[in-house]
């Protein structure tokens, strides 16, 4: 969201007048993200943490939007694309509020993607310390042997970084294919491509949010 002057943040949220806001800022009673604010400072109302006398001021100037999108194949998970490819935002252009994707799905992966303008939720879902899992339905061509399943569940290393083990569970075998569930605790780039033995990916859940069989 576009940044605004700190005084305007106070007046927009009906906390105090502009002049009163200037006085409390000059007195050192206001902090932005834990740092004492000064006159002229600007804030992002959706993502910055503003405190007045030790109390967090919540932004109530815009409504929060939460979208659970069944992302189809062929869309990139960005707000814009320099190559001119279709982005996921083109699928929600009628929302009326600016939203952005939480995390990402590869262009040729499909399934649950959360879009929101809630910065706090985005941080909770994406910060590594929260260790929220992502579950994918993966169709593997052919049958998966016990040895292959053991290998898939073993730790791997990408670019010198040791990843947490992927949990893989066989759900069923259909028409010569193996239907599995992959649970990833890290979104490390290339982890899926290094893990999958020629398969299609469909993300069913992200953190505590589960996607059921919904159309895009």
Question: Each PLM stretch: what is its role?
Answer:
Residues 1-216:
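Basic, flexible Lys/Arg- and Gly-enriched helix-loop patches that mediate nucleic-acid binding at interfaces
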């Amino acid at each position: 969201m576009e940044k605004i002057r700190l005084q305007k943040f106070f007046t927009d949220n009906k906390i105090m007048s502009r002049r009163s806001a200037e006085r409390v800022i000059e007195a050192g009673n206001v902090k932005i993200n834990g740092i004492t604010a000064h006159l002229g400072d600007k804030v992002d109302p959706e993502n910055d943490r503003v405190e007045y006398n030790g109390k967090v001021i919540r932004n109530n100037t815009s409504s929060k939007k939460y979208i659970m999108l069944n992302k189809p194949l062929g869309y990139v998970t960005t707000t814009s694309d320099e190559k001119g490819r279709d982005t996921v935002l083109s699928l929600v252009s009628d929302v009326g509020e600016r939203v952005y994707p939480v995390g990402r799905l590869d262009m040729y992966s499909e399934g649950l993607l959360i879009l929101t303008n809630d910065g706090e939720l985005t941080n909770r879902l994406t910060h590594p310390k929260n260790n929220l899992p992502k579950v994918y339905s993966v169709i593997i061509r052919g049958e998966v042997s016990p040895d292959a399943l053991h290998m898939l569940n073993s730790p791997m290393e990408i670019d010198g970084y040791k990843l947490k083990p992927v949990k893989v569970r066989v759900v069923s075998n259909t028409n010569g294919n193996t239907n599995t569930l992959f649970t990833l605790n890290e979104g490390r780039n290339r982890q899926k491509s290094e893990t999958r033995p020629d398969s299609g990916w469909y993300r069913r859940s992200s953190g505590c949010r589960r996607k059921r069989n919904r159309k895009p």
